[in-house]
């Protein structure tokens, strides 16, 4: 029997996606990354067909002995590279991780202080997202415009006056670290907890180019496992032995997660092993690339945010493109040239401008994993200039992008061949390859 037309269409769309995004585009979305072929190989396993409610060795289903093993191993590996004591991999996203933490720390009507939206607070921290859905009142801490960050002195005063149930740091437009160490003592002095959303910078934390929030006073840290940490899409929660973690871990199931998408677990474990051996060099190259791209864009006439601070300390670069038509127009124009970024609110934008903000948010972590370095950041900046400033034919620029990608199709910061793999992996892993 030949394939029905509907099936042919599904296969055609999937193939087109794989060819386009894996081989023909510059993927510069700050919240995305790519797994290694090794991680992808264990992702496609029988685990994706199975259920396992509850914690390892305390399940509500039978048939979970290997799930218990791989989940425990993955948590141990994640704790090792994070230098933490507690890890829970059951949240299926960073937002679910946040929801589980927020719900334990506050009741409807309680108050939470968050980093200013101008300083990059994620939507889940706000009344428009998870906090609002839980009925928790969000109050933004004061913004320091010059440093694109929380205003520490004013925030301390607000913490003392408001006495919130918890304070959230971390963000989605996240160029510079939020002041964890400076605020933690004042948060704890009023009996509150400090939550750090490290979704975007987790790979930089375990790669030791970004300070560990848990070592600076955060009570609990939520992360995504697919941004600067290049694993499968999912979430995780970490702590250094806090009572809050125990409470959250007791309630993730059944409040927010039933089955937790078990095929993530071996892929997360593999990525943790990769980052154990290659994570520091990867994180260092990410930050060198983001700085190089920011400088190259500025040299070509773009208004790059944070010039007085060195532009960025993360994987992200933020660019004001109002003079060229705004973020919405320019993001679409770049996509026509196979350069994939997202429009983004900048610190001085009003929230109601979310559909057509001033800026672009650019992330270098995925193209870094494909092996790009500082010289390629210069080339990328030149491609931006051709599309946006020089107004070159986007189809001609698109051809340049495709030609450029031909040299960057192989995932780096992983085990290159079977000889490398044999040094570090068990016999069971070898059988999968």
Curated annotation (Swiss-Prot):
GO terms for molecular function: glycine hydroxymethyltransferase activity; pyridoxal phosphate binding. It comes from the Archaea. One of its GO terms (cellular component) is cytoplasm. InterPro entries: PyrdxlP-dep_Trfase, PyrdxlP-dep_Trfase_major, PyrdxlP-dep_Trfase_small, Ser_HO-MeTrfase, Ser_HO-MeTrfase-like, Ser_HO-MeTrfase_PLP_BS, SHMT-like_dom. It is found in: Cytoplasm. Gene3D superfamilies: Aspartate Aminotransferase, domain 1, Type I PLP-dependent aspartate aminotransferase-like (Major domain). (6S)-5,6,7,8-tetrahydrofolate binds at residues 121-123, 243. The modification N6-(pyridoxal phosphate)lysine is found at residue 227. PROSITE patterns: SHMT. Its EC number is 2.1.2.-. The record marks 226 as: Plays an important role in substrate specificity. SUPFAM superfamilies: PLP-dependent transferases. Its main location: cytoplasm. It is an enzyme of class 2 (transferase). Keywords: Amino-acid biosynthesis, Cytoplasm, One-carbon metabolism, Pyridoxal phosphate, Transferase. Pathway: Amino-acid biosynthesis; glycine biosynthesis; glycine from L-serine: step 1/1. GO terms for biological process: glycine biosynthetic process from serine; tetrahydrofolate interconversion. Its cofactor is pyridoxal 5'-phosphate. Homodimer. Catalyzes the reversible interconversion of serine and glycine with a modified folate serving as the one-carbon carrier. Also exhibits a pteridine-independent aldolase activity toward beta-hydroxyamino acids, producing glycine and aldehydes, via a retro-aldol mechanism. Belongs to the SHMT family. PANTHER family: SERINE HYDROXYMETHYLTRANSFERASE, SERINE HYDROXYMETHYLTRANSFERASE 1. This is Serine hydroxymethyltransferase. The gene is glyA.
């Amino acid at each position: 029997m030949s394939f029905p037309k509907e099936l042919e269409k599904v296969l055609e769309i999937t193939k087109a996606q794989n060819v386009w995004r894996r081989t023909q585009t510059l993927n510069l979305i700050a919240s995305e990354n790519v797994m290694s072929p090794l991680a992808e190989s264990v992702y496609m396993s029988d685990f994706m067909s199975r259920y396992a409610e509850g914690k390892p060795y305390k399940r509500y289903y039978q048939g979970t002995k290997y799930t218990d093993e791989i989940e425990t191993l993955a948590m141990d590996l994640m704790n090792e590279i994070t230098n933490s004591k507690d890890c829970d991999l059951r949240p299926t996203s960073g937002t679910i991780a946040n929801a589980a933490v927020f719900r334990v720390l506050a009741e409807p009507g309680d108050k939470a202080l968050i980093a200013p939206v101008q300083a990059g607070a994620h939507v889940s921290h706000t009344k428009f997202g998870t906090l609002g859905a839980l009925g928790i009142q969000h109050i933004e801490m004061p913004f320091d415009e010059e440093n694109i960050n929380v205003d520490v002195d004013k925030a301390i005063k607000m913490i003392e006056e408001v006495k919130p149930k918890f304070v959230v740091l971390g963000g989605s437009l996240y160029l510079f670290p939020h002041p964890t160490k400076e605020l933690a003592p004042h948060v704890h002095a009023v009996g509150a907890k400090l939550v750090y959303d490290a979704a975007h910078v987790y790979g930089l934390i375990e790669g030791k180019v970004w300070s560990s929030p848990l070592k600076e006073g955060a009570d609990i840290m939520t992360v995504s496992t697919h941004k600067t940490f290049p694993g499968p899409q999912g979430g995780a929660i970490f702590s250094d032995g806090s009572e809050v973690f125990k409470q959250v871990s007791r309630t993730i199931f059944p409040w927010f997660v039933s089955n937790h998408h078990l095929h993530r677990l071996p892929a997360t474990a593999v990525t943790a092993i990769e980052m154990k051996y290659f994570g520091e060099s990867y994180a260092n190259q990410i930050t060198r690339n983001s700085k190089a791209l920011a400088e190259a864009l500025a040299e070509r006439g773009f208004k790059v945010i944070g010039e007085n601070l060195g532009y960025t300390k993360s994987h992200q670069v933020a660019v004001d493109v109002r003079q060229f038509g705004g973020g919405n127009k320019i993001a679409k124009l770049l996509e026509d040239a196979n350069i994939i970024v997202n429009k983004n609110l900048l610190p001085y934008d009003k929230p109601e401008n979310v559909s057509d903000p001033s800026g672009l948010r650019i992330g270098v972590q995925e193209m870094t994993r494909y092996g790009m370095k500082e010289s390629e950041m210069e080339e990328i900046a030149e491609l931006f200039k051709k599309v946006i400033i020089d107004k070159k034919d986007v189809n001609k620029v698109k051809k340049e992008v495709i030609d450029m990608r031909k040299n960057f199709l192989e995932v780096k910061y992983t085990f290159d061949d079977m000889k490398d793999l044999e040094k570090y992996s068990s016999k069971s892993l070898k059988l999968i390859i």
